């Protein structure tokens, strides 16, 4: 009987209840709210769902995640394995044709990165270090894997808050962007009908990822793993002879890696890391970054329209953030409301895919400036 009592006491002592804190309770509530938003409201369910469940797991005391499969999942993020693999799948799903057909839209993708640097400046004004500010600023690029990649490099203690902000705002693009787009454009500008894009040859589509990889990687070697995998996936898509690799990259592989990446991100959301004033600042700075990025793209679109005599609809500039293809769809919806004959989707895909490259370049630039400081 005494042995039984000792065993019971041992179970009680080892249980998580004795180590359970108010912070754990709050974070489990946060996880439940995120699960509701993901599955009931369909806010980025493929990403917020696993992140939210990872948050629940991270706040179970004495969970033993220092070893075993959970440790390997966490290592996949800290060792920068998962983000490049996600980019491989993204590349296989991306059509760079609209960008190749209208190269000047690359400038719109670059202009939208103003949100990244505006948030960087704002974060430094709020007391964050340069490295932390850079990791926060990249939220404005609307690119979850790049946000996770840069946060892991520069501010791993902020990874959970940055990832949640990035993916939350990506899901809210249809709500955040239209008011900004309408604020900075006139009815006449929104009604502009753009000429149909030229047809892009297979040769151009094959050469583009090769040339882009060589040039950009030589310029910013620190993002070679991200950009290289993005372009490799695209090469699988466009070569015409690697259909199996392309199919695996854009389906089975990216789905599998997404589970591990998102769950591993959620595992960083322990109470001691997430419950702070900094988290609130990051959420607000993320919104500021999105608004500035959208405004920057639209304003540069207005400038292009002025220069080319009204051939460019400024609305496609908002697609310069790299939320693919959501931002391009928003441009299409807003343009169609202004002029039902308007079809901006393919035009907006140019700056949209340029934004993917632009965000990676912005991340590489900040890494080059800050990683050794």
Curated annotation (Swiss-Prot):
Record PTM: The N-terminus is blocked.
Check the record and name the InterPro entries matching this protein.
OadB_MmdB
- Describe regulators of its activity: Completely inhibited by avidin.
Provide the leader sequence positions: none
Membrane spanning stretches: 17-37, 38-58, 81-101, 106-126, 132-152, 156-176, 206-226, 257-277, 280-300, 343-363
State the EC number(s): 7.2.4.3
GO annotation terms (biological process): sodium ion transport
Q: Does the keyword Cytoplasm apply?
A: no
> What compartments host this protein?
Cell membrane
GO cellular component terms given for this protein: plasma membrane
In terms of pH, the activity is described as:
Optimum pH is 6.4-7.0.
- The reaction(s) this protein catalyses: (S)-methylmalonyl-CoA + Na(+)(in) + H(+)(out) = propanoyl-CoA + Na(+)(out) + CO2
Membrane topology listed for this record: Multi-pass membrane protein
Q: Report which superkingdom the organism of origin falls in.
A: Bacteria
Q: Name one GO molecular function term.
A: glutaconyl-CoA decarboxylase activity
Decide whether keyword Transmembrane is in the record. yes
Function statement = Tunnel subunit of the sodium ion pump methylmalonyl-CoA decarboxylase, which converts the chemical energy of a decarboxylation reaction into an electrochemical gradient of Na(+) ions across the cytoplasmic membrane, thereby creating a sodium ion motive force that is used for ATP synthesis. The beta subunit catalyzes the decarboxylation of the carboxybiotin carrier protein and the coupled export of Na(+) ions. Can also convert malonyl-CoA into acetyl-CoA.
Complexes and interactors: The methylmalonyl-CoA decarboxylase is composed of five subunits: the carboxyltransferase alpha subunit (MmdA), the tunnel beta subunit (MmdB), the biotin-containing gamma subunit (MmdC), and the delta (MmdD) and epsilon (MmdE) subunits.
The UniProt similarity line reads: Belongs to the GcdB/MmdB/OadB family.
| Name used for this protein in its record | Methylmalonyl-CoA decarboxylase subunit beta
The opening ranks of the lineage are: Bacteria, Bacillati, Bacillota, Negativicutes, Veillonellales
